[in-house]
Regions:
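Compact, glycine-rich, soluble single-domain proteins
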Residues: 1-105
Length: 105
């Protein structure tokens, strides 16, 4: 799976197992270059994360319902949604609430 944002192809990694959902981006040292997708998830935390991220929350139809740029470490975000995307910094600048997030397989 991938998406195109600002003419860049970005790989989407669906987190489907309990372990992958629990770990998410915690303890990652290398810069984040992919989008990590949590299904049936409307809250995240950034505890134990070593870098800031952008967050996008979608409804079941992939409509963007919430965007937050530059989420710092040790924060909790709780918003109503179906999918939560943890994204590289700067990704939110090209997106708008109300738009549909395009996912290609």
């Amino acid at each position: 799976m991938h998406t195109i944002i600002n003419d860049k192809k970005i790989k989407i990694i669906p987190l489907t197992t309990f372990l992958s959902k629990s770990k998410g981006l915690m303890f990652r040292i290398k810069p984040i270059k992919k989008i990590y997708m949590f299904k049936k998830c409307s809250s995240i935390h950034t505890f134990f994360m070593l870098q800031n991220i952008d967050v996008c929350i979608l409804d079941k139809n992939y409509k963007i319902v919430y965007l937050k740029e530059n989420v710092k470490k040790n924060r909790v975000l709780i918003k109503k949604g179906y999918y939560t995307l943890e994204m590289p910094l700067g990704t939110c600048k090209c997106l708008k609430v109300g738009e549909f997030f395009s996912i290609k397989k």
